[in-house]
Every structure is written in structure tokens, then in C-alpha cells.
Amino acid sequence: MARPRLLFVSPQFLFPADAGGKIRTGGILRGMKGGYFEITLVSPATTEQPRRFARELSEICDRFLFWPVSKSGKLFGALKRMAALASRLPASVALDRSRTATALIADMLATQPDVVVADFVHAAVLFDRVPPVGSVVFTHNVEAEIFARHAQTAENPFARMIWGAQRRKMAEFEARHLPAFAKVIAVSHRDLSFFLETYGVRGAEVIPTGVDFDYFGALASPPPAVVDPRGGHLIFTGSMDWPANIDAIQYCMNEIWPLIAVTRPEARLTVVGRDPPGALVDKARTRGLNWQFTGFVDDVRPFIRDADLYIVPLRVGGGTRIKIYEAMAMRRPVVSTSIGVEGLPIEEGNHFRRADTAAAFAETVLQLLEAPPQGAEMAENAYDFILKRYSNRRVARTFEEICRRAAVSDSRNRPPEPVALAG
């Protein structure tokens, strides 16, 4: 008997899994592969990516289709981004538009899949019609909130104006397109409440954040029992072309690190993540900071394992941070701002330490470096907590069940309703 068919539309190619959204989506699809649905994944890709990542794709879908994209030069890319800022759409959405993608997705919808999943609200721009039944949008964040927080933290008036304009455009886009889907999946109860109260979405449900314990747990170990009294090794992981992560590292560099270095002049920080801005790397070098920017790495685990503490000095963000659970799965003590742990059901003091000012962040880091057993106990508590509740397998089962309930049945012959796109 043929399995029900699920069409999964992603506005980004999912490999390498070097960003939180890719990691989250890939983990869910991997957990669903071979289950209730036959999965067709549709996304952009260069001509070589499907061949290069054939094994990874086979682990997350039964069939992969793509619309072709080509890598653009720096000048052309900059011009595209400038044009996107002038669009009536949010810039990040305008950059995802593709007539080829829309035609491909329309062809796939004509085959009447049982469920259609749009990954991120951005994917709505790729549909000329969203089926009124059997349609699901998977929201990783409240996107407008991210822009609002950038506007709040930006020191440059022009930057504040740009971020503010993007917030307004994204809020309009979310309010218009999220209710077009039969179901909205959020990654936290906080996001869920926002969608229900602000945008009036229907059929909204929440899934927890998960982590791949088979992968991260394989290299997990207790943190070092002794830390050099003048040093200590901290780590931050995240895509360093993502503005929120850039802001976090700038904040750490300018306000937190000087307070740490006074007491521990040999302390060091490793920043793991793709494409760190050259200006940021140069600034760390010019200041003589004991920092390492790795750029993209194939495996983040050895870097986390070698650190004494995992820090998350985020001032901007949305949704939930998978990186928190990855650090906890490797038994590393976590120090984070409130935004860093937002939406995660973890307990302050028992699972992580919270610090929302530069002085508090530096003081908390120094306290844990001075008392490694305290950090080790907290890390073990966090490890046990998420191991029992938040594996990717459990999250994938929840996601699959939501999609099963959304599957088209008696009403599949209803004509789809058009979704007019702005911009």
C-alpha cells in the first residue's frame, strides 16, 4: 500500500548543516524518513550540490527536486541585497523569490500531495497558491521580532531605520501569509502564543527543540576538573554571517571580554562558524585578543569538547537556539542571556546560568571558571534533563503526527485558494 505523500518546500539547500534552521529541519526530516509519509523535498541547489550531498539527501527524503541557482559574485550579490531592501517585501523574502521555483512547486501541487510543508514563512513567496487543506508552515522564529531586536540594539541611526523598516515589512508578511496555511508549527509556546494573538493563525501547534544525541553524545565528556587560574577556554558556535551572532560577538568583544581579561588575562575564546566578517576578525587581532575564528568546520564537536564553558551572549534572536542543547548534550556548562535561552524549558541555576548585563556575564563566567565542580554538576543536570525529553527522534514523531492530522482526506478536491504576493 502506497504511503501518503508529503511535499516539503525549503527556501534553502539543507547541506552543509551549518545553521540552526538547517540543523533543525534536517533532524526532523531524518527522523521522519521511512515513516508514515513518502517525503519529496524541494529546494534550491546548484548543479553540483545534489551529487555532492547525495548520501545526506537520501537520509532525509525519498525524492529530491530542485530549482537551479548559481553562485553570484560579491558585487552582484551586493546589488541584489540593495534591490531587496527597496522591495515591498522583507529583504530576506525578496531574495528567496524565484519564478522557476514557483513553477516547479505548482507542478508538484498539481499532483495533489497529501500534505504540503513550507519551511519558514519565507517559503510562502514561492507558492502561487497555498492549498486550503493539508498545508503546513513550519516557523522557526517570529521573524518580525528578530528585526525589532536588531532595531533596538543598533547604535547607528541609519541601521535602526533599516531594521525598523524590515520589521514592519516582515510583520505585514507574516500577518498576511501565516493564516493562509491550515496549520502553523511553532518551536516554542512563546512563539505559539504570539502567532495566535497577533496574527490570528488557525490550527497552530508547537513542537519542542530537539538535539541529535547519537551524534553529540558520542563525543560527550565531563568538563575539565581543573582550569588554569590565569586562563580558561570559552566557546561560541553559530553561523558568523548571521547578524544576531555577529552582534553577540561584538558585544562580547567590546563589553564582556575586557572584564574577564582583567582577572584571567590568558583566557581564550574560540568562535566556530562559517564566514566571520573580516572586520571583526581584524578587530580581535588588532586588540591582541586571545581569540580564534575557525570559519566553517565539518565537525563542531571537538571544539565544544575542548572548551571549559559554552557562552551565548545573544542580544538578538527569535525561536529557540539548538546550540544550547548541543552544548548540553556534550556536557558543557552554559552561560547565556535570557534571549539565548528564550523558549527553552530549562531551569536557571540547575541547567544553565543566566546573565543579562556585561558585568553579570563576565562575573558568572569567572565564577564557573573558579569552581569547575559547580559547572560540571550543572552540565550533568542539563544533560540528563534533555536526554530524557528532547531527542530528535521524539521531536520528529511529534512533527509527523501534526502532519498526519493535517493530511488531506475527504476535502482534497476543494479548489486551492490563491495567495496574492506583495512586492
Labelled PLM ranges:
Residues 182, 305-319, 330-333:
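Acidic donor-binding loop of glycosyltransferase active sites
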Residues 190, 207-210:
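Carbohydrate-associated surface elements
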Residues 148, 211-227, 281:
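Acidic anion/phosphate-binding donor-loop and adjacent secondary structure
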Residues 11, 75-94, 136-172, 239:
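Acceptor-binding helix/loop patch of EC 2.4 sugar-transfer enzymes
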Residues 264-302:
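Nucleotide-activated donor-binding/catalytic signature segment of Leloir-type glycosyltransferases, i.e.
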Residues 352-359, 367-372:
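Conserved acidic donor-binding segment of nucleotide-sugar-dependent glycosyltransferases
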Residues 323-326, 333-337:
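Short hydrophobic beta-strand element within catalytic cores of glycosyltransferases
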Residues 374-388, 395:
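A short, well-ordered alpha-helix in the C-terminal region of glycosyltransferases
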